[in-house]
UniProtKB/Swiss-Prot annotation:
TM stretches of this protein: 69-89
Segments forming domain PLD phosphodiesterase: 215-242, 434-460
Membrane topology: Single-pass membrane protein
Glycosylation sites: N121, N302
Native source species: Mus musculus (Mouse)
Protein name: Inactive phospholipase D5
Stretches for region Disordered: 503-536
Extracellular side: 90-536
Keywords linked to the UniProt accession: Glycoprotein, Membrane, Repeat, Transmembrane, Transmembrane helix
InterPro entries tied to this protein: Diverse_PLD-related, PLDc_3, PLipase_D/transphosphatidylase
Signal peptide as annotated in the record: none
Compartment(s) where it occurs, according to its Swiss-Prot or TrEMBL record: Membrane
Stored SMART domains: PLDc (SM00155)
A GO molecular function held by the record: hydrolase activity, acting on ester bonds
């Protein structure tokens, strides 16, 4: 034991440390273990590389998506901006044929047109105007490109002896369809018309309006547009009776594309409802009014400085900048300083439903206001016929009553009774003719005129589709003034033996009627003859 200790102690220090180092050194790994570690390391490196590639791709994808979102948002903003820009300007549709307020014609000719039934006689000096049939045929003969017609009636091809003018008009329309002239027609859906079917087969475009689906009304509009230049508007529809037995009145504008620019939009509005069961919540800007009571069309009519605009009914059919018929009538009455003359078939300020009838004060109240508050003289010429509502006389009595105790309140009412003329006809004449009726629907004042499609009945304005025309003129003394001509027509009818101040009698004086002259013996157009103004 001592010897071994001595031997250990006698060994060199270097030798001892070398042995300790050898004993503490780990064993060398085996080759297989080395390969496993290398493979594991390589796998980790590959996964790390794949993860970095995926992260880079993800970043690129997110960046690309963000760019797409930004681009999409910019495109949407640009589209909205373009829409706003175009909504701020007047877009001219194809139907307007490139017309604008800058290039349209506002120096126009205008003519009153009337249909005076055969056997209706006036005094020698009574004014007469262009016959309605001749005026309509003139328009169709002038047509070169297009004829657009809105009418409440389509009954031209009748077998009655008095329907010959209606048949000629129908034949002319058929002829136009074969001459490469575009014919567009608008009618109420309830019209069961062989005339429309025949014209449709020949190529005419027919639009049926289902007013019942909108507000339980019907179409009563009556106007024409020819070649985007000429216009007719008035009381007459395309009915043979309007060219024979009915007393009708309207106006024709020649070379007046500025008025067409506005009226065409009402025609387009009707056409836009062709396949719709309800009115859109927002109208297209193409249907907005061009002129209204606030912005009237400035034009020359027969070289007379004038203003004009068209109105529409019901309120449901009045897009932005389109005057409602009631508002148009209000503007005419409010501007009157001396007198208001009104000629209508029916005057009945009542709104009726299936269950009740209520007072409708819109026009009746405006008349009372003019009488009482502004001392404007009012004359009402109302047709008397078998459909006259007995309540009409009650409302007339009520109107008259307000003037009994008020100074400077002047109201006179007459009933235009063609039943008297019918009663004086011979048996042979009665067999050949239908009852005659005055269907005029207009108002004239000392500075303006309104010509429309409605009687002054509540339901007409609130439910039915109709169009009105307002004309303002400062100088109404010139015989070329359409307002003076219309005033002369009113006075002619007012002073005729057919107008009575009280409820008409059923026993007419036939001998007095035989002494008067028929308008058929008068020239087609004549100026007013200078009759003294209507006494008030």
């Amino acid at each position: 034991m001592e010897i071994r200790q001595h031997e250990w102690l006698s060994a060199s220090p270097h030798e001892g440390f070398e042995q300790m180092r050898l004993k503490s050194r780990p064993k060398e790994p085996s080759p297989s273990l080395t390969r496993v570690g290398a493979n594991f390391y390589s796998s980790v490196k590959q996964q790390d590389y794949s993860a970095s590639v995926w992260l880079r791709r993800k970043d690129k994808l997110e960046h690309s998506q963000q760019k797409c979102i930004v681009i999409f948002a910019l495109v949407c903003c640009f589209a909205v901006l373009v829409a706003l820009i175009f909504s701020a300007v007047d877009i001219m549709g194809e139907d307007e044929d490139g017309l604008s307020e800058k290039n349209c014609q506002n120096k126009c000719r205008i003519a009153l047109v009337e249909n005076i039934p055969e056997g209706l006689n006036y005094s020698e000096d009574a004014p007469f105007h262009l016959p309605l049939f001749q005026g309509w045929m003139n328009l169709l003969n002038m047509a070169k490109k297009s004829v657009d017609i809105v009418s409440s009636h389509w009954d031209l091809n009748h077998t009655h002896p008095a329907a010959c003018q209606g048949q000629r008009l129908f034949e002319k329309l058929l002829q136009l369809t074969s001459q490469n002239i575009e014919v567009k027609l608008v009618s109420d859906v309830t019209a069961d018309s062989k005339v429309l079917e025949a014209l449709k087969l020949k190529g005419a475009e027919v639009t049926y309006m289902n007013m019942t689906a909108y507000n339980k009304g019907r179409l009563q509009s009556s106007f024409w547009i020819v070649d985007k230049q000429h216009v007719y508007i008035g009381s007459a529809g395309l009915d043979w009776r309007s060219l024979g037995q009915m007393k009708e009145l309207g106006v024709i504008f020649y070379n007046c594309s500025c008025l067409v620019l506005d009226l065409q939009r009402i025609f387009a509005l009707y056409s836009s409802l062709k396949f719709k069961s309800r009115v859109p919540q927002t109208w297209s800007k193409r249907l907005y009014g061009v002129y209204d009571n606030e912005k009237k069309l400035q034009l020359q009519l027969n070289e007379t400085k004038s203003q004009a605009f068209v109105s529409n009914s019901p309120k449901l059919f009045c897009p932005k900048n389109r005057s409602f018929d009631i508002d148009a009538i209000y503007s005419v009455i409010d501007d009157a300083k001396q007198y208001v003359y009104i000629a209508v078939t029916d005057y009945l300020p009542i709104s009726s439903t299936s269950s009740k009838r209520t007072y409708w004060p819109d026009l009746d109240g405006k008349i009372r206001e003019a009488l009482v508050l502004r001392s404007v003289k009012v004359r009402l010429l109302i047709s008397f016929w078998k459909e006259t509502d007995p309540l009409t006389f009650n409302f007339i009595s009520s109107l008259k009553a307000i003037c009994t105790e008020i100074a400077n309140c002047s109201l006179k009412v007459k009933f235009f009774d063609l039943e008297r003329e019918n009663a004086c006809a011979t048996k042979e004449q009665k067999n050949q003719t239908f009852p005659k009726l005055n269907r005029n629907k207009y108002m004239v004042t000392d500075g303006a005129a309104y010509i429309g499609n409605f009687d002054w009945v509540g339901n007409d304005f609130t439910q039915n589709a109709g169009t009105g025309l307002v004309i303002n003129q400062a100088d109404v003394r010139d015989n070329r003034s359409i307002i003076k001509q219309l005033k002369d027509v009113f006075e002619r009818d007012w002073y005729s033996p057919y107008a009575k101040s009280i409820q008409p009698t059923k026993q007419p004086n036939c001998s007095s009627l035989s002494k008067l002259k028929s308008p058929s013996k008068q020239p087609a157009m004549a100026n007013a003859t200078g009759r003294e103004p209507l006494s008030v």
